[in-house]
């Protein structure tokens, strides 16, 4: 997915002249070597050692006494929501069936005791559907233990939910053209250039609350600010933050669920079959999703995997094929609709060659080619596309996962909400009352998340967040 993934240079600041430069350089050289062994041409440049002067030209806002130099290496960034939605649409294009707002509430078994299907609840309508399957693969992340229990399993894989929090600050607030990676006493902290912003994080703390709504706390935000400010020439404050977001990592853990430091738990994935007919995969990370998928399916089909080898490495995601031709066509579209170069880059990065479909919408309704009045980084067509092509059912889907307005603007997208609702309403069949209910629901969520950020710990922050009810609440499991 070359349109979704961008190479990003990072600096690893050095505090010691000799041993640290040699130690870090050797580690990153190994990283480069392993990357070179991957199939295909090399995607990233090799690492470089930088003097203090050269380091300062790349990141002027690094405090003068914070480092004597740096090692520059390359990594990549991706919008996880865009990647996942594009992945789902790609799977559907190959014949898969995908259903959002649908929850597995029970697993079914045959006469032999093997799992042979699942009972699903449509969280929108409340309707139950039973799906039969030759084999069920459980890839439910931090819900792994809950869903394993549906099969009556008590000894399967165990995961620890680890919370990671990031803050978002305006790009002009920090002077730099590259990212930073900083070692902390618990893990690492990244300062990542991202479009018009800097994303700073992450934390790594065990999460023992309900996994549905992880939230940032005052303690999380203070931790990030303290560690970032230790190396920045112009310290950040809470007033600089325009957004935060929190997520949970499903970290594999031996034995039972109880644990202390999530930073010491493995990030690798494991595949197991706790009961016949059920394969469980847990652990891993976003960047290894294709390897995880291959391993899970190979495990599930057993000996047939030899005759049916995985071809995932040969399958590009939607938007990748024809990308270069679309870049050229985009010049014509930009001239026709008055799009600035930044908008064209934004659209190509998010949609790749699928941008043609957005242009088709604009040709049918030229008003869709205009930016949103209170969120001009996005076109009105992107809201339409999020509903018509990407399965958004609610305003929160559009502001959290089809756009990222929830943390890209200070008000979490509230000013743009009426216009977004007006675009979505006819596509989703909302009358005025339903549209207002959607606006009210998202407003309550945004306000609750804002308030939660001022709470000292996870328990109190979650309690504040839960003051806003879900538009489609999860159902109890039948384990």
Where are these regions (language model features)?
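Short beta-strand segments that buttress and anchor functional surface loops
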Residues: 72-73, 118-123
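Glycine-rich beta-alpha-beta "Rossmann" dinucleotide-binding loop(s) and their flanking helix/strand
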Residues: 91, 146-165
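Residue-level detector of anion-binding/catalytic polar loops
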Residues: 97
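A conserved short coil-to-beta-strand element within the FAD-binding core of flavoproteins
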Residues: 100-116
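A structural signal for short hydrophobic beta-strand segments in well-ordered beta-sheet cores
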Residues: 104-107, 190-191, 271
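Short, hydrophobic/aromatic-rich segments at coil-to-beta transitions
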Residues: 114-119, 175-177
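Core beta-strand elements of the Rossmann-like FAD/NAD(P) dinucleotide-binding domain
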Residues: 124-135
């Amino acid at each position: 997915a070359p349109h979704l993934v961008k190479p990003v240079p990072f600096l690893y600041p050095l505090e010691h002249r000799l041993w640290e430069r040699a130690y870090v350089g050797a580690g990153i050289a190994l990283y480069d070597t392993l990357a070179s062994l991957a199939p295909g041409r090399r995607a990233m440049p090799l690492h470089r050692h930088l003097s203090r002067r050269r380091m300062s030209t790349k990141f002027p806002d690094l405090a003068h006494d914070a480092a004597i130099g740096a090692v520059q290496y390359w990594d990549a960034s991706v919008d996880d929501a865009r990647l996942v939605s594009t992945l789902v649409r790609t799977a559907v294009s190959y014949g898969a069936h995908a259903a959002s707002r649908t929850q597995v509430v029970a697993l079914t078994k045959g006469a032999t005791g093997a799992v042979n299907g699942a009972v699903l609840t449509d969280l929108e309508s409340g309707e139950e559907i039973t799906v039969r399957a030759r084999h069920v693969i459980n890839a439910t992340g931090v819900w792994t233990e809950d869903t394993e229990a549906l099969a009556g399993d008590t000894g399967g894989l165990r995961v620890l939910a680890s919370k990671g929090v990031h803050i978002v600050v305006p790009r002009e607030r920090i002077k730099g053209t590259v990212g930073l990676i900083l070692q902390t006493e618990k893990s690492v902290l990244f300062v990542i250039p991202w479009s018009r912003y800097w994303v700073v994080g992450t934390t790594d703390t065990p999460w023992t609350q309900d996994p549905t709504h992880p939230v940032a706390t005052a303690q999380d935000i203070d931790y990030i600010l303290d560690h970032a400010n230790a190396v920045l020439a112009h310290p950040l404050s809470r007033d600089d933050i325009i957004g935060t977001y929190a997520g949970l990592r499903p970290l594999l853990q031996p034995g039972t669920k109880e644990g202390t430091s999530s930073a010491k738990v493995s990030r690798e994935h494991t595949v197991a079959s706790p009961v016949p007919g059920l394969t469980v995969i847990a652990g891993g990370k976003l960047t290894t999703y294709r390897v995880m998928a291959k391993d899970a399916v190979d495990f599930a089909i057993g000996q047939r995997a030899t005759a049916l080898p995985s071809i995932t490495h040969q399958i590009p995601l939607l938007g990748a094929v024809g990308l270069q031709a679309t870049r050229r066509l985009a010049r014509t579209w930009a001239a026709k609709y008055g799009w600035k170069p930044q908008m064209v880059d934004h659209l190509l990065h998010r949609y790749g060659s699928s941008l043609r479909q957005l242009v088709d919408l604009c040709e049918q309704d030229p008003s869709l080619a205009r930016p949103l009045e209170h969120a001009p980084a996005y076109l009105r067509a992107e809201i339409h596309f999020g509903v018509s092509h990407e399965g958004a059912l609610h305003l929160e889907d559009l502001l959290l996962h089809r756009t990222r307005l929830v943390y890209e603007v200070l008000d979490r997208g509230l000013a743009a909400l009426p216009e977004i609702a007006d675009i979505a309403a006819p596509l989703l069949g909302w009358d005025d009352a339903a549209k207002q209910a959607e606006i009210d629901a998202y407003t309550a969520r945004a306000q609750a998340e804002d308030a939660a950020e001022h709470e000292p710990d996870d328990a109190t922050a979650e309690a504040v967040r839960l003051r806003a009810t879900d538009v489609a609440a999860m159902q109890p499991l039948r384990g």
